[in-house]
Amino acid sequence: MTDTRHASPPRLSTAGAAALYIGALLGPSLLLLPGLAAREAGPASVLVWLGLLVLSGLIALVFTRLGTRAGSATGVAGYTAAGLGPRAGQAAAWCFLAGVVTGAPVVCLIGGAYVAELLGAGGRTAYVAALCLLVLVLAVRLGGLRTGSGLQLVLVAVLVTLVVVAVAGAAPEARAAHWTPFAPDGWGGVARAASPLMLAFVGWEAVAPLTARLRDPRRQLPRVVGTAFAVTALLYLGLAVATVAVLGPRAGGPVPLAGLLRVAIGGYGPLLAAVGAVALTLAATNAYLTGATSMAAALAGGAGTRRGTAGTVAAVAATSALLLGAAGAGLVTTAQLVAVPTALFLLVYLGCMAAAVRLLAGPVRLAAGVACAVVGLLLAGSGWAALVGAAVALVAGTRARPDPSARVRSRAPERRHNPEAGRSEPVDPGPASDVCGQSVTGP
């Protein structure tokens, strides 16, 4: 078998890179979160979406600068290690891996909910369908089948099409009365909706592997990120507004897209939504597990892929059985299930933003500081789930044994004098270790 790990990938145009970036940002969580936010905050959930879009813009700006400075050899763990040290980088890697593992059952539950809606069945059917989807994905993963980027882009295009059809087709049924009361549970409900919604914005770190495929990263990358931000912002806001304005009292359900499509095109709406949700769930979960397997192998010091696959599958199976079983028994809610991977990803982003404060300079450093503070507040607002994330980070950080020969440079950035500017500027901290090079997009 030929080793193609070091083969040079084809160069990307700005449009092609933007398409891949949008594919990394959009996922099955878009099918659930508008309804979840509306349930917690009512029409005021739109304000939460707006606020988090501003935050995601700051995060995108920071990752753009990190991507152009640190290059494709680094990922979220590499950025954290470069600014905060190798132990922090190791903790970030494990938090990200744990986020993918705990996010897998949530993604499958999204697909299961749309199947249950199609069948007109209750919540238990959704959990059974989620387990069936998960078993299928794990079997495929053990078989070694990967989800190609081409298929991912096709499925994302299908998702975008469904959202556009749903929003545009259902728009005539919007009612002003559905916007009152604007905040039925007060600002407490708005605050509760904020942390889970961050799951929709996981993916900005995917800028790392794209930089190596751009002809001129410093010129192209800002355009790529700007395009991706504009497209995703329109989709998120459009779906959030339509969910509230059209569905009204039914906005808080687990399948908002099915409800909008039913209004837009009639009885075939839930069928299209279910088919799209199941296909996206299977492909996205397989892609997440593929990336998680690679990261697990790297964290294990380069252990065999087969061993890493078996370990990842076992971890996902055990975690999913625990979480879905607890949800099916009524011990936890869907919102609480979403809170676990969200808290883990928030911890990763907190580390990246804190590292960026040390590594970068100028306005981007200020953006990183603001983003770091807001992410910290969101993490604190996630409640008990933050304790789960903190435990993972603490154990990973204290048990890590950094290799002295690793290429991670954990020092603060060196400074180089710029005669034209009359000041010193940070120097690229250099590439990170291979462990940090793994990049996995979240749900």
Model-predicted regions and their roles:
Residues 5, 9-109, 198, 206-207, ...:
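Transmembrane helix-boundary motif of multi-pass solute transporters/channels
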Residues 50, 54-58, 98, 131-139, ...:
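Generic alpha-helical transmembrane segments of integral inner-membrane proteins
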Residues 58-134, 139-142, 156, 278-298, ...:
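Hydrophobic transmembrane alpha-helices that form the core helical bundles
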